Amino acid sequence: MGAHSADGIAPRRSKLRAYLLLARVSNLPTVWTNVLAAYVIAGASFDSLLIASLSLSLFYTGGMFLNDAFDARFDSHARPDRPIPNGDASQREVFIIGFALLAIGESLLVLQPFPTRAARWGLALAAAIVFYDYAHKDKLYGPIVMGLCRALVYLVAASSATGIEPYRVVGAASVMMAYVMTLTYVAKLAGRGDWVPWLIAGIRIVDAIFITMAGGGPVAATVAIAGFIVTLALQRVVPGT
């Protein structure tokens, strides 16, 4: 980000830069490997992988926009360089975009092989995202709901492609939920340390382990591991927190 002025406010950014910051796009690769891992574990055909990845990317991006929209008052004094308090985007604008992205993500699920089941899990994910964004400052409930959101990504992806939620997918989702809960809880206690981006990128390593254990082959596992480096590199351009 640009140099800060004496009052802590960053220079005005372009809309594109503001939206990239709001979306925390550097973390999107972790969503893609979540979807890939869910497909591999569920034994699903990759024919619908792209739509699932796009849908869940929109869920994630919408959630990130809403995170800033709900936090606008807090950020005005705690993080004045965030796009809303910095004047790069209005709170109303960010709310509208956030909810629109969730709606589009949910709508894309009708294109999946099992749209009804996918839509139900998608609504559960949307509800969890909105609840997290509204109440995540609570140090007890926030990490739990954040972990639940990640677990639901697995369930949306697997159910949309296969129509079921195999116990292996539920197990992997539970492990990922525990990982993200721990990451979020520690980050809330310790603040945004230099190691937090590594833990976020580490989601891809967990996915790579799941893919390997499920017999997904070296290519899929390598993609997930390579994404660890990609995520860290992107976080140097667009911060992931």
Please tell me what each predicted stretch does:
Residues 12-19, 59, 75-87, 101-111, ...:
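Short juxtamembrane and helix-loop transition motifs at transmembrane-helix boundaries
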Residues 54-55, 72-129, 147, 153, ...:
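Multi-pass membrane catalytic core of lipid/isoprenoid biosynthesis enzymes
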Residues 42-46, 113-117, 159-166, 213-219:
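Membrane interfacial helix motifs at helix-loop boundaries and amphipathic/re-entrant anchors
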Residues 35-42, 105-113, 129-133, 153-161, ...:
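Structural signal for membrane-spanning alpha-helices in multi-pass inner-membrane proteins
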Residues 1-81, 89-94, 118-124, 133, ...:
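Topogenic membrane-insertion module of multi-pass membrane proteins
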Residues 191-241:
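Extended hydrophobic alpha-helices typical of membrane-associated regions
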Residues 69-75, 138-147, 163-171, 189-195, ...:
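A cytosolic-side transmembrane-helix exit/cap motif
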Residues 57-62, 125-133, 150-155, 175-185, ...:
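Alpha-helical transmembrane segments and their membrane-interface exit regions
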